[in-house]
């Protein structure tokens, strides 16, 4: 080989390990998803579809019976680097990647190669291969989601009765437990798992229905037979392509799952602030948080996840835009999907794995949680006092006004809500000391076990 040919060979080998569309940056590829969207795997799936079609056509007497075996023999040990080079060269001439692909396979196969792609249109191959890849991608996403569920469940059960102040609008509300907080994220992740399974079913449809979807060349029976061989479903009614609402469902599901990860990441970020200090994501001994400030411990993984979730929402919109193609199809979807499908699946895969690592290594500061709760007194018990007054016969509006006054005084003067209530003439007259103390004696975690039971019992 000349020096230039050697460089081209090395470039092609590198390209085979990169995504077919070269969209996702290397920084966020994980090996499993990178391999799935590699150019080599894309070409392998195209070959797989072509061979499955040839087998079915031979079985139904459409092409000679010996053709599939001859094709399989010709493609044994197929050099995908050479196939990619051939495709690249011919695509410059044809300006059509599938036409170039079929022409290259025909060269490899020799005389039996004339039966390749018999009765097919390009997207019979592309969409059916996409279904194979997307089905496997969804399987990887489900597996990662289940790993996150396991980590969340373990951490939630560990902290079932670890008290933490609940906050609404960013302001102290009433106590809850860290376990219940994490259990909520577990339940949301479980729902995202179910949505991913539904989306996996939705995208597991291929088509061999020809140029406008009427199956007039090969027939619906052959389409069904090939899909059974590939472990897919035949699209009930297609055009030249599988309807894009299927892809839109997947991209929307991915965006929803990403938003769930973003919500968890945001919670960790907020509780990791210096003035809160209740938890922190893992931080390695040799890790550095700033080029200028050695003391910094930034929640960079959670921040990264939040940024990626924004990308996923954009891809969900792309999926919706791709639904309305012209008549029996145009090609406006193609360029968008070459980016959106590998990027979105790969990003969610990365985000989910990283969040699992964060949850497993989450640093919990229970002492700081307790300190934060006690630092500002017990005015958060105001609802208990309100309910006691209502039970004693006071109108809700009047009772609310009294307790608001007592709570404000407790905050302003730094005294307990009980002392403030006993110093409030109307409250003290209605409840007296024993009634106030009894009203404020409350276990905020009394129903934690029941909530855990109803969430986890089905699992």
Q: What are the language-model segments listed below?
A:
Residues 23-41, 84-85, 91-93, 100, ...:
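Catalytic-core signal marking the mid-to-C-terminal active-site face
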Residues 223-316:
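Acidic, glycine-rich loop-and-beta core segments that form the ion-binding/anion-interacting portion
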Residues 20-209, 215, 220-225, 234, ...:
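A helix-coil-helix interface module used to build multimeric assemblies
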């Amino acid at each position: 080989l000349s020096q230039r040919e050697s460089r081209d060979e090395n470039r092609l080998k590198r390209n085979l390990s990169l995504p077919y569309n070269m969209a996702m940056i290397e920084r966020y590829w994980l090996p499993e998803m990178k391999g799935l969207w590699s150019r080599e795997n894309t070409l392998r799936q195209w070959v797989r579809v072509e061979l499955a079609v040839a087998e079915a056509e031979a079985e139904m007497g459409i092409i000679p019976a010996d053709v599939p075996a001859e094709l399989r023999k010709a493609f044994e040990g197929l050099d995908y680097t050479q196939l990619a080079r051939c495709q690249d060269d011919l695509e410059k001439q044809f300006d059509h990647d599938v036409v170039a692909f079929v022409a290259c396979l025909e060269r490899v196969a020799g005389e039996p190669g004339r039966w390749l792609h018999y009765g097919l249109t390009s997207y019979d191959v592309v969409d059916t291969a996409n279904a194979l890849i997307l089905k496997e991608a969804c399987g990887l996403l489900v597996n990662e989601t289940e790993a996150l569920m396991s980590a969340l469940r373990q951490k939630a059960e560990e902290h079932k009765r670890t008290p933490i102040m609940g906050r609404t609008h960013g302001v102290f509300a009433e106590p809850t437990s860290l376990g219940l907080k994490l259990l909520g994220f577990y339940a949301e992740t479980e729902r995202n798992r179910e949505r991913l399974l539904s989306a996996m079913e939705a995208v597991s449809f291929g088509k061999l229905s020809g140029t406008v979807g009427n199956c007039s060349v090969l027939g619906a029976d052959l389409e069904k037979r090939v899909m059974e061989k590939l472990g897919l479903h035949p699209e009930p009614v297609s055009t030249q392509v599988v309807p894009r609402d299927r892809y839109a469902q997947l991209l929307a599901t991915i965006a929803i799952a990403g938003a769930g990860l973003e919500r968890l990441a945001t919670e960790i970020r907020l509780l990791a602030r210096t003035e809160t200090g209740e938890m922190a994501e893992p931080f390695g001994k040799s890790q550095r948080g700033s080029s200028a400030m050695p003391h910094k411990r930034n929640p960079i993984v959670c921040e990264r996840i939040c940024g990626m979730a924004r990308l996923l929402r954009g891809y969900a919109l792309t999926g919706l835009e791709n639904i309305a193609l012209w008549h029996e199809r145009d090609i406006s979807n193609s360029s968008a999907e070459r980016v959106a499908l590998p990027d979105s699946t790969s990003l969610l895969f990365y985000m989910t794995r990283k969040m699992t690592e964060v949850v497993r290594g989450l640093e919990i500061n229970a002492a700081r949680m307790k300190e934060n709760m006690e630092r500002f007194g017990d005015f958060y018990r105001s609802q208990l006092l309100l309910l006691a007054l209502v039970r004693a016969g006071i109108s809700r509006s009047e009772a609310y006004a009294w307790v608001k006054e007592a709570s404000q005084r407790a905050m302003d003067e730094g005294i307990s809500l009980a002392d403030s209530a006993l110093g409030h003439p109307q409250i003290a007259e209605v409840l007296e000391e024993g009634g106030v103390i009894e009203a404020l004696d409350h276990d905020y975690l009394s129903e934690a076990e029941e909530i855990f039971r109803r969430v986890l019992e089905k699992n």
